[in-house]
UniProtKB/Swiss-Prot annotation:
It comes from Arabidopsis thaliana. GO terms for cellular component: extracellular region. InterPro entries: CRR_secretory_protein, GNK2, GNK2_sf. Belongs to the cysteine-rich repeat secretory protein family. Disulfide bonds: none annotated. Residues 1-31 form the signal peptide. Its main location: secreted. Pfam families: Stress-antifung. PANTHER family: CYSTEINE-RICH REPEAT SECRETORY PROTEIN 29-RELATED, CYSTEINE-RICH REPEAT SECRETORY PROTEIN 38-RELATED. Gene3D superfamilies: Gnk2 domain, C-X8-C-X2-C motif. It is found in: Secreted. This is Putative cysteine-rich repeat secretory protein 23. The keyword Repeat applies. Keywords: Repeat, Secreted, Signal.
Length: 260
């Protein structure tokens, strides 16, 4: 997919280190086109930098190692005088090993791209990693977003395709942000689905980070889905990602479909 508009805003993250992640039990599927492609990053320069070998650097490295070891749960750690917040969100169909691998890749990747920045965000197919030392409200981070869309337009009835794409994504939004979708149950704040398009199929997913409430997940998804027409109308595939929620749709199977 070719990238399009990138929106940036430097509102930033809490004084604790937390991992919010989701690993769901999923059914096996065939012909799954699954990658861990690098997507985008932001270096949050207003948060300043730190020196290699400093206490901050040691605390951050130790925290990343702790998160990797404790990948199945939430982690809260103070970092002495240098409060650090780390949020890792893996895609809902990620296994523990896939999530751990994505954390390693993301930390290495953002360390190269944002050398010694205290504030940085990086997106991959399988995870998003946020590192910061400043308190934030999740709504303030909504402008930290970007989108991709397929350069190819759909053939045939584009209006019908757009309507079916919108209907499927909003259906998944309702499923992901349902009050019945309580914490500690599979597929919390995450949903996948498919829709028949004649001889083809449309596949889609939506997800919120698990530091959001169900109500705020619904708000976040409504906000980014409102960008769907401008983002992706008539396109064979598209995705819109923020630090708190995202959606994606394609005409090929890119995600393991969740069981009902």
């Amino acid at each position: 997919m070719s990238s399009s508009f990138v929106y940036k805003s430097l509102f930033l993250v809490p004084i604790l280190a937390v991992v919010a992640m989701q690993l769901s039990f999923v059914q096996s599927v065939l012909s799954l086109n699954q990658t861990n492609e690098y997507l985008h990053h932001l270096c949050l320069n207003r948060q300043g930098t730190y020196e290699s070998g400093s206490k901050y650097a040691r605390d951050l490295n130790n925290l990343i190692q702790m998160i990797s070891i404790s990948i199945l749960g939430d982690v809260v750690v103070f970092s002495g005088d240098n409060s650090i917040y780390v949020k890792l969100q893996c895609r809902g169909d990620s296994s523990t090993s896939t999530c751990r691998s994505c954390l390693d890749t993301a930390f290495s990747g953002v360390s190269r791209r944002c050398l010694n920045n205290k504030g940085r965000i990086i997106w991959y197919d399988n995870c998003v990693l946020t590192i910061s030392n400043i308190s934030y409200v999740w709504r303030d981070r909504l402008p930290e977003q970007f989108l991709y869309f397929n350069a190819k337009d759909v053939s045939g009835d584009a209006k019908s395709f757009n309507e079916k794409t919108r209907t499927l994504l909003y259906k998944l939004k309702e499923k992901a942000s349902s009050k019945e979708n309580i914490p500690n149950k599979k597929n919390y704040l995450y949903a996948t689905g498919e829709e028949s398009l004649g001889k083809m199929k449309l596949y889609a997913m939506v997800q919120c980070t698990q530091d959001l409430s169900i109500k705020n997940c619904n708000v976040c998804l409504n906000w980014i889905l409102g960008k769907l027409p401008k983002c992706c109308n008539d396109k064979q595939g598209g995705r819109f990602l923020s630090t708190s929620c995202n959606f994606r749709y394609e005409l090929y199977l890119f995600v393991k479909l969740t069981t009902i």
